[in-house]
């Protein structure tokens, strides 16, 4: 293909007031830069150069294997940034798309249309322009009396009359590679900011008699830039709505989209119902016929079919088919549940395997444990897995019955079909089918309470 792309991602984004490079702030679960890289790749462009500056090492890690990285050591403006990509495009004679790294809503189809229009127009440069309802903050496209583009004026340098123009420069261009980098070297910082503006290349081309075309975008939302946290929230809201609409179109019921938050990387099966105030994040996968929420958060979780998760938190865990979770359960990383497992209210499970049909109904902690199939873990059971230095395992065999308020002091094994008496502290292994009881014998003193009251009188 005769297309290459350069993504300008060197700015710090001072208005974000963050230590993190602006382009790495997450939108709907992914760094905003990843949206632009993916859109470029989806448009069929294989040669991609990302120009990084502030936080360049972090940016490079994000695009590793997807793009080459050019370094802009000193942030001297967009023209200077594009110039840093020159060595990576040495000998390239095709067309160069130039994009900003802070416009995550841009779509691959728009980039393909821009490139196609540029070819048809036979121009040296083509601008992607738009007419938003509020053009404030954007550079204005200046045309002559015949409608030809003659220059772009940044808003900070625009006159009052120029600020009334609604057509804006989106910061996305298509250039002929031939002559581009020579023209960039001719740009001077003759503006209020003392920076080398890429927009000045339009006047250079016009003075040289080279054609500059403009392709107007139908949906200005695509080029919404993110410069501060407020704009980040606006784009997040827009993208989340789009994600939820896609889910609903695929057969998922979202009871209240306004209070449901699903990352773009999440997959949900049909006939699943998502209740309000549910957060599905990261690489979470939800099966079919599930009920998720209300008030639940799942992060990088894998959930089977027919599962209920109510008012619970599930982090990096796997849940088998037909399980019931919650309310108010907490599944911590590396937890794996088999089929038909019940994890009830106020139960915390960490780094444990729970077998098919087992139940942990309420008020229990299970950590570093392997629990077999058909096990019942009574209310208030605790696996005492930490001795102050090390975490120790607990193993419970198939069909075991753990009485309420049992303390299992790890390392310890409970055999298949074994039973522990309520209130026991188990420190030794229990054989298959055995009963283990460890508690003080009950003492009964008749009439003790009345005598105690009489003494107080």
UniProtKB/Swiss-Prot annotation:
Its EC number is 2.7.7.23, 2.3.1.157. Its cofactor is Mg(2+). CDD domains: GT2_GlmU_N_bac, LbH_GlmU_C. InterPro entries: Bifunctional_GlmU, GlmU-like, GlmU_C_LbH, Hexapep, NTP_transferase_dom, Nucleotide-diphossugar_trans, Trimer_LpxA-like_sf. Mg(2+) binds at residues 102, 227. Binds 1 Mg(2+) ion per subunit. It is an enzyme of class 2 (transferase). One of its GO terms (biological process) is cell morphogenesis. It holds the Pfam family NTP_transferase. Acetyl-CoA binds at residues 385-386, 404, 422, 439. Pathway: Nucleotide-sugar biosynthesis; UDP-N-acetyl-alpha-D-glucosamine biosynthesis; N-acetyl-alpha-D-glucosamine 1-phosphate from alpha-D-glucosamine 6-phosphate (route II): step 2/2; Nucleotide-sugar biosynthesis; UDP-N-acetyl-alpha-D-glucosamine biosynthesis; UDP-N-acetyl-alpha-D-glucosamine from N-acetyl-alpha-D-glucosamine 1-phosphate: step 1/1; Bacterial outer membrane biogenesis; LPS lipid A biosynthesis. NCBIfam families: glmU, PRK14354.1. PANTHER family: BIFUNCTIONAL PROTEIN GLMU, NUCLEOTIDYL TRANSFERASE. Catalyzes the last two sequential reactions in the de novo biosynthetic pathway for UDP-N-acetylglucosamine (UDP-GlcNAc). The C-terminal domain catalyzes the transfer of acetyl group from acetyl coenzyme A to glucosamine-1-phosphate (GlcN-1-P) to produce N-acetylglucosamine-1-phosphate (GlcNAc-1-P), which is converted into UDP-GlcNAc by the transfer of uridine 5-monophosphate (from uridine 5-triphosphate), a reaction catalyzed by the N-terminal domain. Homotrimer. This is Bifunctional protein GlmU. The lineage of its organism: Bacteria, Bacillati, Bacillota, Clostridia, Eubacteriales.
């Amino acid at each position: 293909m005769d297309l290459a792309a350069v993504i300008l991602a060197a700015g710090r984004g001072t208005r974000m007031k963050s230590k993190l490079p602006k382009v790495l702030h997450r939108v709907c679960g992914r760094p905003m830069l990843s949206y632009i890289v993916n859109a470029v790749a989806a448009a069929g462009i294989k040669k991609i150069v990302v120009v990084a500056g502030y936080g360049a090492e972090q940016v490079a890690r994000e695009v590793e294997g997807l793009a080459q990285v050019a370094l802009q050591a000193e942030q001297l403006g967009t023209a200077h940034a594009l110039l840093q990509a020159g060595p990576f495009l040495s000998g390239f004679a095709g067309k160069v798309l130039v994009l900003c790294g802070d416009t995550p809503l841009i779509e691959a189809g728009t980039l393909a249309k821009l490139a196609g229009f540029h070819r048809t127009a036979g121009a040296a440069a083509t601008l992607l322009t738009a007419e938003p309802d509020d053009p404030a903050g954007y550079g204005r496209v200046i045309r002559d009396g015949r409608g030809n583009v003659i220059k772009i004026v940044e808003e900070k340098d625009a006159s009052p009359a120029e600020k009334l123009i609604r057509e804006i420069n989106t910061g996305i261009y298509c250039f002929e590679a031939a002559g581009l980098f020579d023209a960039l070297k001719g740009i001077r910082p003759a503006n209020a900011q003392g920076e080398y503006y890429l927009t000045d290349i339009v006047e250079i081309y016009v003075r040289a008699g080279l054609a500059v075309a403009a392709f107007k975008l139908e949906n200005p939302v695509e080029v919404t830039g993110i410069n501060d946290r407020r704009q980040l929230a606006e784009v997040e809201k827009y993208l989340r709505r789009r994600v939820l609409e896609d889910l609903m179109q695929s057969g998922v019921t979202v009871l209240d989209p306004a209070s449901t938050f699903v990352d773009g990387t999440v997959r949900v099966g049909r006939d699943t119902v998502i209740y309000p105030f549910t957060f599905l994040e990261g690489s979470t996968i939800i099966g079919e016929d599930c009920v998720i929420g209300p008030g639940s958060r799942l992060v990088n979780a894998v959930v089977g079919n027919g599962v209920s998760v109510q008012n619970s938190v599930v982090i990096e865990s796997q849940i088998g088919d037909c399980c019931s979770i919650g309310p108010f359960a907490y599944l911590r990383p590396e937890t794996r549940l088999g089929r038909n497992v019940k994890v009830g209210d106020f139960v915390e499970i960490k780094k444990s395997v729970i077998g098919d049909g087992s139940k942990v109904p309420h008020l229990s902690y299970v950590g570093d444990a392997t629990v077999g199939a058909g096990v019942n873990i009574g209310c208030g059971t605790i696996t005492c897995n930490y001795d102050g230095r090390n975490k120790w395992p607990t193993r419970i065999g198939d069909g075991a019955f753990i009485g309420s308020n049992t303390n299992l002091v790890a390392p310890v094994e409970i055999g298949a079909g074994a039973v522990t008496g309520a209130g026991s502290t188990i420190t030794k292994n229990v054989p298959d089918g055995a009963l283990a009881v460890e508690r003080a014998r009950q003492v009964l003193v008749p009439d003790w309470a009345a005598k105690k009251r009489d003494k107080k009188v």
